[in-house]
């Protein structure tokens, strides 16, 4: 179910503080965060946010098309290694 319009988008407070600090200091380093549940806001456009995927921080460069989505959508947590090849196909 979608989030109510009257509530507005959810963003962790500590992430907003980090984004404001980077915007004022004009720093180019990625912002490291574990908050995959935060919604991408228009203020994030042009920033690089390192989102944790459970093992490492994946750098995500935020573009205008990402606004409204969650940060976790852009840092995949599962790696697909492929299905086992059949023995008949190898012959």
From Swiss-Prot:
Coiled coil: none annotated. Gene3D superfamilies: 30s Ribosomal Protein S19, Chain A. It comes from the Bacteria. GO terms for biological process: ribosomal small subunit assembly; translation. GO terms for molecular function: rRNA binding; structural constituent of ribosome. The keyword Ribosomal protein applies. GO terms for cellular component: cytoplasm; small ribosomal subunit. Keywords: Ribonucleoprotein, Ribosomal protein, RNA-binding, rRNA-binding. Protein S19 forms a complex with S13 that binds strongly to the 16S ribosomal RNA. Belongs to the universal ribosomal protein uS19 family. This is Small ribosomal subunit protein uS19. It comes from Aromatoleum aromaticum (strain DSM 19018 / LMG 30748 / EbN1). The gene is rpsS.
């Amino acid at each position: 179910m979608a989030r109510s319009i009257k509530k507005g988008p959810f963003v962790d407070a500590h992430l907003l503080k980090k984004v404001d600090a980077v915007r004022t200091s004009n720093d180019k380093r990625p912002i490291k965060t574990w908050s995959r549940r935060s919604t991408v806001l228009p203020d994030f456009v042009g920033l690089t946010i390192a989102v944790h995927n459970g093992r490492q921080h994946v750098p995500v460069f935020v573009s205008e098309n990402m606004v409204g989505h969650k940060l976790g959508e852009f840092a995949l947590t599962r790696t697909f290694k492929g299905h086992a090849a059949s023995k008949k196909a190898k012959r």
